[in-house]
Amino acid sequence: MNINSTLFLQAVVFAILVWFTMKFVWPPITKALDERAQKIADGLAAADKAKSELSSANKRVEAELATSRTETATRLADADRRGQGIIEDAKARAVEEANKIIAAAQAEAAQQSVKAREALREQVALLAVKGAEQILRKEVNAGVHADLLSRLKTEL
């Protein structure tokens, strides 16, 4: 064979190989490469989407935490106010009860004082009558001199 015919035959075989490769080998390879590229692109898109969703979820969580903190602070302040109100009410009731007890004790003391004064007047009147009886050396009749004794009580 001649170089020219060999070269020509090699060129024909090469062309057939190129055609066969382009027709039967290359499309599945490009299809597999395209599918792989699509999977990678989908994975990257899913990763970006997940990243944005994570960022959004973190923002929502932070917002919820802030809301929860403010709500908790509000509830604590409200509970503190209620506690102070209850304490103030209890103090006011205690002061009111103490004032009632003091007023009752003062009234009872005044009543006891009046009773004691009356008892002292009675005793002083009896002592005065006994003293007068001893001075006069005669008996003073309490029934007869009741008017005199009552005036003596009022004067004392």
Swiss-Prot record:
Q: What is this protein called?
A: ATP synthase subunit b
- So which domain of life are we looking at? Bacteria
Keywords attached to this Swiss-Prot or TrEMBL record, sorted alphabetically, are: ATP synthesis, Cell inner membrane, Cell membrane, CF(0), Hydrogen ion transport, Ion transport, Membrane, Transmembrane, Transmembrane helix, Transport
Protein's UniProt keywords contain GTP-binding:
no
GO terms of molecular function: proton-transporting ATP synthase activity, rotational mechanism; proton-transporting ATPase activity, rotational mechanism
Family affiliation = Belongs to the ATPase B chain family.
List the InterPro entries hit by this protein, alphabetically.
Answer: ATP_synth_B-like_membr_sf, ATP_synth_b/b'su_bac/chlpt, ATP_synth_F0_bsu_bac, ATP_synthase_B_chain
- Which organism is this protein's natural source? Polaromonas naphthalenivorans (strain CJ2)
Topology of this chain in the membrane: Single-pass membrane protein
Protein's job: F(1)F(0) ATP synthase produces ATP from ADP in the presence of a proton or sodium gradient. F-type ATPases consist of two structural domains, F(1) containing the extramembraneous catalytic core and F(0) containing the membrane proton channel, linked together by a central stalk and a peripheral stalk. During catalysis, ATP synthesis in the catalytic domain of F(1) is coupled via a rotary mechanism of the central stalk subunits to proton translocation. Component of the F(0) channel, it forms part of the peripheral stalk, linking F(1) to F(0).
- Which stretches are transmembrane? 7-27
